[in-house]
């Protein structure tokens, strides 16, 4: 019983420590990475290039899961898309 509690505690701790982020990928101008006219699987490949676990086209932009913390994702609060 103690072993089971210890095992579950370790799993919870791993889930807290290995925290990944998710969000919309950005292009070089700070805009969401468009997938409007891209082929199927485009966003999954782009997310994989950024070391994400998966991604899909959340029309019309690429949304990724499991991204490392160093990857910049689009944020409404810090949006610089189309602004000079």
Curated annotation (Swiss-Prot):
User: How does the record describe the protein's post-translational processing?
Assistant: C-terminal amidation is important for high activity.
SUPFAM superfamilies in the cross-refs? Scorpion toxin-like
Q: What tissues is it present in? A: Expressed by the venom gland.
The keyword rRNA-binding is annotated on this UniProt entry: no
Dependence of activity on temperature: Optimum temperature is 25-60 degrees Celsius. All temperatures tested are optimal.
Q: Which residues carry this modification: Cysteine amide?
A: 81
Return the annotated site residues (Important for activity): 32, 59, 74
Q: Which InterPro entries does the record cross-reference, listed alphabetically?
A: LCN-type_CS_alpha_beta_dom (IPR044062), Scorpion_toxin-like (IPR003614), Scorpion_toxin-like_sf (IPR036574), Scorpion_toxinL (IPR018218), Scorpion_toxinL/defensin (IPR002061)
One annotated GO molecular function is:
sodium channel inhibitor activity
N-terminal signal peptide: 1-20
GO CC terms in record: extracellular region
Enumerate the Gene Ontology biological process terms.
defense response to fungus; killing of cells of another organism
Keyword presence, Disulfide bond: yes
pH dependence comment: Optimum pH is 4.5-7.5. Is almost completely inactivated at pH 11.5.
Q: Where does this one sit in the cell?
A: Secreted
Q: What is its main location?
A: secreted
List keywords of the entry alphabetically: Amidation, Antimicrobial, Disulfide bond, Fungicide, Ion channel impairing toxin, Neurotoxin, Secreted, Signal, Toxin, Voltage-gated sodium channel impairing toxin
Query: Which cysteines bridge via disulfide bonds?
Result: 31-81, 35-57, 43-62, 47-64
Other notes on this protein? Is the main neurotoxin of the venom of T.serrulatus.
Q: Reproduce the free-text note on domains from the UniProt record.
A: Has the structural arrangement of an alpha-helix connected to antiparallel beta-sheets by disulfide bonds (CS-alpha/beta).
What is the protein's known function?
A: Voltage-gated sodium channels (Nav) gating-modifier. Acts both as alpha- and beta-toxin, since it affects not only activation but also inactivation of Nav channels. Binds to Nav domain DII and impairs the four Nav channel voltage sensors movements. Depending on Nav channel subtypes tested, can also bind Nav domains DIII (low affinity) and DIV (very low affinity). Acts on almost all the Nav channels tested (mammalian Nav1.2/SCN2A, Nav1.3/SCN3A, Nav1.4/SCN4A, Nav1.5/SCN5A, Nav1.6/SCN8A, Nav1.9/SCN11A, and insect DmNav1). Is highly active against both mammals and insects.
**According to its UniProt record, which protein family does this protein belong to?**
Belongs to the long (4 C-C) scorpion toxin superfamily. Sodium channel inhibitor family.
Protein's UniProt name: Beta-mammal/insect toxin Ts1
């Amino acid at each position: 019983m103690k072993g089971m509690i210890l095992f579950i505690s370790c799993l919870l701790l791993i889930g807290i420590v290995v925290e990944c982020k998710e969000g919309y990928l950005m292009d070089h101008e700070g805009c969401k990475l468009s997938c409007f006219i891209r082929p199927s699987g485009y966003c999954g490949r782009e997310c994989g290039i950024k070391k994400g676990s998966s991604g899909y086209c959340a029309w019309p932009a690429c949304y990724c899961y499991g991204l490392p913390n160093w990857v910049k994702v689009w944020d409404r609060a810090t949006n610089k898309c189309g602004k000079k």
